A protein has these predicted regions:
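Aromatic- and carboxylate-enriched substrate-binding clefts and catalytic-loop regions
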Residues: 29, 36-39, 242-506, 537-539, ...
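Beta-sheet entry/capping signal
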Residues: 21, 58-60, 67, 143-144, ...
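Conserved, mostly hydrophobic/aromatic
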Residues: 14, 144, 236, 404, ...
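Catalytic and substrate-binding clefts that recognize carbohydrates or anionic sugar/phosphate headgroups
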Residues: 4-7, 15-16, 29, 51-211, ...
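Surface-exposed interaction regions enriched in Ser/Thr/Asp/Glu
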Residues: 728-742
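Catalytic core of carbohydrate-active enzymes
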Residues: 406-407, 413-416, 425-434, 452-455, ...
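Short, well-ordered beta-strand segments enriched in hydrophobic/aromatic residues
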Residues: 14, 24-26, 61-65, 558-560, ...
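Solvent-exposed beta-strand/loop surfaces of large extracellular or lumenal domains
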Residues: 34-50, 574-595, 702-726
Length: 742
């Protein structure tokens, strides 16, 4: 920390965080450290090269890509490396234990962020809101704001606060908090992709889920018992509908459907796991599920003080209640021996995850964190760490996800599939989320795209199955969930056309798994989400911020939901359903029929990896991969990613990649497949790939100069068009070049 010059009672400090980020903190003597800092939410980064100098009443801190000038009165100017002013403030007013900050930005700036603070818009100028976790209205607020102008601001606070982005005063962003210091991380980055990279480098990248979590998750009816749930498993297999996760809703625990504490046991009437079967999963229903390749998810609710465990992990002492007997106590009545706590659930010495280990040992691999009570206000509660709810409320769902994720990892050594409806800044590094009890329409889509602007990638919602549009959207998400909580949404109970649509899209998603998994890994490395708003990918596209129902699904697939038109960015695009190519820069009608519920357009030059039909993903390496090439006159490439699907070995380089390039020149299209690099346990010995070219005038092909057999056929998502030709090759130690000739 650099102590800056200060007049008055404020303490002004600055800290170089990275080459593109500087932290500024203006505090009173009594302001405590933010819970996010105290509890290790931020990544530990090496100190970058920086300079610091005093110029009169100002302190100037410079890192490679940014410069912060702070006045002794709390005024500041934040600039990029060229000296261009990005944002500035005439001063931060500390008041009533909190602060009132007025920050100027450039006229005409487009501003994004705040997570789930609104589901009505993407761009935020002229918008004001309170950053406070709420049921339905705001499940996952995020205190990060950034602009296409090249600046970003992360408020390091969990206190209830309000943000006004030019709604009350043009080109002025006002942040008012009821408590805590004005503590911000300021970022300088030239574009959104770079900004998300820098932001998630500081706060944490999106978690990489188990491979099977990117398949289909089915939440069973709460009235189910063991027989009904096992029948659901069998029906997915019998109906030839791929699925990987089966989730239990309230009712799986004994004594209470809504069990808020740590005394849970299996409900022996609905989901019996007899004591004599403990330690022998093969004899239980969980073993039977595993044998047909399902992973069990358990529903949880909570009313438990997680702050004690956070204090312990932060290195602070948490003293359990002591039993104290007085020598003069004749009766030794235990009611008087310890403190009388209003909280009857929390056990000071027991981390919340501790009681779940036995269920993990029995075979549970996934936990659904319901909103019930984690997102509720607790206005009269004093938490164990000394915080009131004004400071703890936003923090609670974040540390809940943290303790669940790290608890599972530490207990098993495997990746966690923890998904929750509640969250706060940094949620992406611990859990997947779904859009809460708001269905699967256009507003949940807006929520997902807004969360993408906060670097959160593993998003989903409850799939709508009453129309093909809802099914289309439900499967074109980072992860897919069908909730059957109190309904009869099983696909085999749908009308015939909807049932066929569900089966079609489920199989389509599973064929697309290598692409989705590669994009998920890209998110985990860069902070760039799988689902991307149009303005994130095409910031110069006219009215991109108004296109809230369409989005890029990874690098190369454009889709939309619940609208009759889709606007194509500049360039050429291929209709995935028909194979027809069209020019971009225009709006076209969305044509749906039969099982098709929405559009899919492929960017010219794309290389989409797919695999064959399968009933589950599991953790196995991708085999029989087809590279679907949509040739362009510009050379394009794709790097396929794969790993063991379940461990954290990828963090240490245990993964493999295959790069493929393609370019069309005149009547020739040249595709080169590079040798596989890297390794992981369980990967296939041979590298055999099919290269499928989406061009129907091909008459021949060579592989490394020798004539090769080609076969005509359909694409990965269309049938009956016959607009592709394929060549299968084995790649060993040298690149393989395929030349297609028209």
């Amino acid at each position: 920390m650099i102590n800056c010059k200060s007049c008055g009672q404020n303490i002004i400090t600055a800290e170089p965080i990275s080459d593109s980020c500087i932290r500024l903190r203006i505090a009173d003597v009594g302001d405590k450290e933010c819970g996010m800092s105290r509890y290790g939410i931020y990544e530990k980064l090496p100190t970058p090269e920086f300079s610091s100098e005093e110029k009169g009443e100002k302190t100037v801190i410079t890192v490679k890509n940014a410069r912060l000038e702070v006045g002794s009165d709390g005024s500041f100017t934040f600039s990029d490396a060229s000296g261009k002013t990005l944002i500035s403030s005439a001063g931060i007013e500390k008041q009533r234990g909190g602060f009132d900050a007025r920050i100027s930005y450039r006229d005409g700036a487009k501003i994004y962020g705040l997570g789930d603070a609104t589901r009505r818009r993407i761009e935020k100028t002229g918008f004001a809101t309170e950053i406070w976790v709420r049921n339905i209205r705001c499940y996952i607020p995020v205190s990060f704001i950034h602009s296409h102008d090249g600046w970003g601001l992360l408020l390091n606070s969990t206190w209830r606060h309000a943000v006004d982005i030019g709604a009350s005063e043009k080109d002025i962003m006002r942040i008012v908090a009821r408590g805590g210091a004005f503590d911000v991380y300021l970022f300088a980055a030239p574009d959104t992709h770079s900004m998300l990279f820098e932001y998630t480098r500081v706060i944490g990248r999106p978690i990489m889920l188990p491979k099977w979590a990117y398949g289909l998750s089915f939440v069973a009816n709460q009235a189910n018992d063991i027989n009904a749930t096992m029948n659901d498993c069998l029906n997915f297999r019998r109906e030839d509908i791929p699925c990987d996760i089966i989730g239990l809703e309230p009712g799986w625990t004994a004594n209470s459907r809504y069990h808020f504490g740590t005394d849970k046991e299996w409900n022996q009437k609905t989901y019996p796991v007899p004591g004599w079967q403990k330690g022998d999963k093969s004899a239980t229903f969980l073993g039977a599920m595993e044998r047909i390749h399902f992973h069990l998810s358990l529903w949880l609710c909570i009313e438990y003080d997680l702050s004690y465990e956070e204090e312990r992990q932060a290195g602070y002492e948490v003293k359990p209640d002591e039993i104290i007997w007085d020598d003069d106590d004749y009766i030794h009545d235990s009611h008087f021996a310890t403190a009388a706590r209003l909280d009857g659930n929390t056990k000071l010495e027991e981390p919340f995850f501790e009681h779940l280990k036995k269920f993990v040992d029995d075979g549970a691999e996934c936990f659904k964190l319901d909103g019930c009570h984690q997102i509720d206000d607790h206005p009269d509660r004093l938490w164990g760490n000394g915080m009131t709810d004004e400071e703890m409320h936003n923090l609670f769902p974040l540390i809940y996800a943290k303790q669940m994720s790290l608890g599972y990892r530490n207990h098993t050594g495997k990746r966690a599939m923890i998904y929750t409806s509640g969250g706060y800044t940094g949620i992406q590094k611990y859990a997947a989320t779904w859009a809460g009890d708001t269905g699967g329409g256009a507003k949940p889509l807006s929520s997902m795209l807004n969360l993408g602007y906060a670097g959160h990638s593993n998003v989903s919602c409850d799939m709508e199955t009453n129309c093909t549009a809802g099914i289309h959207f439900g499967f074109m998400q980072t992860w897919s969930q069908l909730s059957n909580w109190a309904y009869w949404n099983q696909p085999w109970f749908l009308e015939d056309e909807l049932k066929e649509s569900f089966r079609f899209y489920a199989k389509l998603r599973y064929r697309l798994a290598p692409y989705i998994y590669t994009m998920a890994h890209k998110a985990a490395q860069t902070g760039l989400p799988v689902m991307r708003a149009m303005s994130m990918e095409y910031p110069d596209m006219e009215k991109a911020d108004d296109l809230g129902c369409q989005y890029m699904f990874g690098d190369d697939i454009l889709t939309s939901a619940f609208v009759d038109e889709i606007t194509l960015p500049d360039g050429k695009w291929i209709n995935a359903w028909t194979g027809e190519k069209t020019d971009g820069g225009k709006t076209v009608a969305v044509c749906t029929s039969g099982v098709i519920g929405g559009p899919l357009y492929i960017k010219e030059g794309a290389i989409i990896p797919t695999t064959g039909d399968r009933t589950y993903l599991g953790t196995k390496a991708f085999e029989g991969v087809t590279f679907n090439v949509y040739p362009s006159e510009n050379e394009t490439s794709f790097t396929l990613y794969d790993d063991d699907g379940i461990s954290y070995g990828y963090e240490n380089g245990d993964f493999a990649e295959v790069k493929i390039t393609a370019k069309k020149t005149g009547d020739k299209t040249v595709v080169t497949v590079m040798p596989r690099t890297g390794a992981f346990e369980g990967m296939s010995e041979k590298c055999i790939y099919t290269v499928k070219l989406y061009q129907n005038d091909i008459v021949g092909a060579t592989v490394d100069g020798k004539a090769a057999e080609i076969s005509a056929g359909d694409g990965w998502c269309n049938t009956g068009t016959g607009k592709t030709v394929s060549v299968t090759v084995e790649v060993k130690d040298s690149p393989v070049t395929i030349e297609f000739k028209a």
